[in-house]
């Protein structure tokens, strides 16, 4: 990751992608594009993420732009696309996407890959796809603050998390992808080859969200408010 390319200050914990989860019994053909979320035949069956960067990523990728765009004209265009989509969206959600998709309350939802993997355990009719227009790839990491009072204990905790057996237990509990290669080799072959849990990133057009500065944060937030209040 750009913030710590040599991993001198942080320890990778989990990672994943953002994509589309869909119920194969509720859609008439496979979903593989963000544009499918603008299809009126899925009115009131679509769940969008209630998150400014995730929502704008979807619209920006739909339009062929970077998810880290700082071009105001592109962002205005993305805002208009989200407003155009809004009448066919069932809800803007975060954690609720998981339960709604499992129960069949919605047919299509924008979701994080770790959540998607969990839903597939609960409902085998659910499929996850990273849209062909591109998406987001992310990584969560641990850091020890420079003013930490118990550095030794923090290091022991991180060493514990890095144990392959613990990493496997953690993965099986939270269902988010792990970067521990030794632990991955301890998983069954089907999971090791899962394109949901451990995709070959070279097969996808993916970007990491960048911090765009306070001015851009304000612009994104204001545009998102316009979408939500429309």
Sequence positions of predicted segments:
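Ligand-binding "clamshell"
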Residues: 4-7, 118-130, 192-194
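A bilobed periplasmic-binding-protein/Venus flytrap-type ligand-binding module shared by bacterial periplasmic
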Residues: 17-26, 61-62, 138-150, 169
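Periplasmic-binding protein-like
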Residues: 75-84, 122-146
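A ligand-binding cleft/hinge motif common to bilobed small-molecule-binding domains
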Residues: 102-103, 108-125
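Mature extracytoplasmic/periplasmic domains
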Residues: 145-204
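Conserved C-terminal helix/tail region of periplasmic/extracytoplasmic solute-binding proteins
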Residues: 202-230
């Amino acid at each position: 990751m750009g913030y710590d390319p040599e991993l001198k200050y942080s320890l990778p914990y989990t990672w994943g992608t953002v994509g589309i989860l869909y119920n194969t019994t509720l859609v008439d053909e496979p979903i593989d594009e963000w544009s499918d979320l603008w299809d009126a035949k899925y009115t009131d069956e679509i769940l969008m993420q209630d998150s400014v960067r995730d929502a704008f990523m979807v619209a920006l990728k739909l339009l062929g732009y970077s998810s880290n765009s700082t071009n105001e004209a592109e962002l205005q265009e993305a805002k208009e696309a989200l407003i155009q989509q809004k009448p066919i969206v069932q809800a803007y959600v975060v954690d609720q996407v998981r339960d709604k998709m499992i129960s069949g309350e919605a047919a299509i939802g924008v979701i994080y890959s770790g959540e998607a993997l969990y839903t597939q355990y609960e409902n085998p009719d659910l499929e996850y796809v990273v849209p062909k227009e591109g998406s987001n790839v992310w990584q969560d990491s641990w850091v020890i603050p420079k003013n930490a009072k118990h550095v030794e204990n923090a290091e022991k905790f991180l060493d514990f998390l890095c144990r392959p057996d613990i990493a496997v237990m953690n993965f099986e509990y939270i269902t988010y992808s792990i970067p521990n290669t030794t632990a991955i080799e301890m998983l069954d072959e089907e999971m090791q080859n899962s394109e949901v849990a451990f995709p070959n990133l070279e097969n996808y057009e993916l970007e990491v969200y960048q911090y765009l500065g306070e001015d851009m944060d304000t612009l994104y937030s204001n545009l998102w408010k316009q979408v939500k209040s429309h």
